Regions:
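N-terminal glycine-rich FAD/FM-binding segment characteristic of electron-transfer flavoproteins
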Residues: 1-109
């Protein structure tokens, strides 16, 4: 079982709120004795994710994901949830992540 953190980025840099979500996930994972898996979309430098506690990083580079759409992003996350035995998903607090969270809750129920 694992905790998945969607680490939102812009211009190949992770948003501050995504790193805060990852730090929260690390603390939760430590309490629950669970590993932390990060999803990074169209990014190249993962050093910040490792510094903030990621155990595993799933790197998805796809030109169709350069512009955020909850449909496409939720398809990626849903596949990861199935293949990685994810039990908890943590999103940061942004308009895109809030929209994505609502979309995911319908897909994963």
């Amino acid at each position: 079982m694992s905790i998945l953190v969607y680490t939102e980025s812009a211009n190949n840099e992770f948003k501050k709120s995504a790193l805060e979500a990852l730090s929260y996930a690390r603390a939760l994972g430590d309490k629950m004795n669970e590993s932390i898996t990060c999803l990074a979309i169209n990014c190249n430098d993962f050093s910040q994710l490792k510094q903030h506690g990621a155990d595993k990083i799933i790197d998805v580079n796809n030109s169709s994901l350069e512009k955020f759409t909850s449909k496409h992003y939720s398809e990626v996350i849903t596949e990861i949830v199935k293949t990685e035995n994810i039990k908890i998903i943590i999103l940061n607090s942004s308009a895109n992540s809030k929209y994505l969270g609502a979309y995911l809750s319908g897909k994963l129920e």
